[in-house]
Amino acid sequence: MNSYTHLLRVVFFLLVAAPGLVIGQTDEGQTAPDFRLQDQNGDWHALSDFSGQWLVVYFYPRADTPGCTTQGCSFRDNIYAFRGVGADVVGISTDPVDRQKAFSDKYSLPFPILSDESGDVARRYGVLIERGEMNFARRETFLISPDGQIARHYQNVNPDTHTQIVLDDLMALSADGDPS
């Protein structure tokens, strides 16, 4: 078994078989935890940069793995629909900047892919899975309202259908004028 296959098995275990190892919790209606992280191009982004607009923050376990690629490409393919209703998208994982850059370039992802190597942001959002030296973010998404509140928290995400669910919710919330 090569090391990549072993890593994928460990990631699978952490995400499916060991959900109790997640640290923290963030609920709908709460103020979204702040962040300041570097993207795939070395630029810094903070939650406050997106103040006044809807923001989709999706966490994923590891760049350029099958589910994460499906999810990232789905957000890419629907980015104009998100922007059409006044929303932006950011992806966050514990991968280093260079891995985020390779992932973003390979799939032409048109939004910030943020590096949370320390796992601090994932921890504050309650999605960090810690297993010794290996930290991963659980695949979860937060829809943050223009006033910085968590309007929706998506758990048990299916990468094949998730983007459309988030977009449908965003369109309904935007149409209602309801920030939460």
Q: What is the role of each PLM region?
A:
Residues 26, 39-40, 144-145:
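Short, acidic, Ser/Thr-enriched surface-loop or helix-capping motifs
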Residues 32-33, 54, 138-140:
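Short loop/turn microsegments at loop-to-beta-strand junctions
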Residues 48-69, 75:
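Short active-site neighborhood of thiol/selenol oxidoreductases, capturing the structured segment around
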Residues 4-34, 178-180:
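N-proximal helix/coil linker or "cap" segments that precede and/or mark the start of modular domains
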Residues 136-180:
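Thiol-/selenol-based redox modules, centered on thioredoxin-like
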Residues 67-109, 117-121:
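Structural microenvironment flanking redox-active thiols in thiol-disulfide oxidoreductases
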Residues 35-54:
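A short beta-strand-turn-helix
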